Amino acid sequence: SISCGESCAMISFCFTEVIGCSCKNKVCYLN
């Protein structure tokens, strides 16, 4: 997986979801 450069440790949500990223292991990754 490619890291989207966004953390989701505090909230289990990625603002980068709009470009196809999702939260995995407290980091946002591109699927």
Swiss-Prot record:
PROSITE patterns: CYCLOTIDE_BRACELET
Record keyword Cell inner membrane present: no
Example GO BP: defense response to virus
PTM summary: This is a cyclic peptide.
Disulfide bonds: 4-21, 8-23, 14-28
The keyword Disulfide bond appears for this protein: yes
Cross-link Cyclopeptide (Ser-Asn) per UniProt, renumbered positions: 1-31
Pfam families: Cyclotide
Tissue: Expressed in leaves.
Domain of life: Eukaryota
Leader sequence segment: none
Function, as annotated: Probably participates in a plant defense mechanism. Has anti-human immunodeficiency virus activity.
Domain commentary: The presence of a 'disulfide through disulfide knot' structurally defines this protein as a knottin.
Entry's family note: Belongs to the cyclotide family. Bracelet subfamily.
UniProt-recorded name of the protein: Leaf cyclotide 1
Organism: Viola hederacea
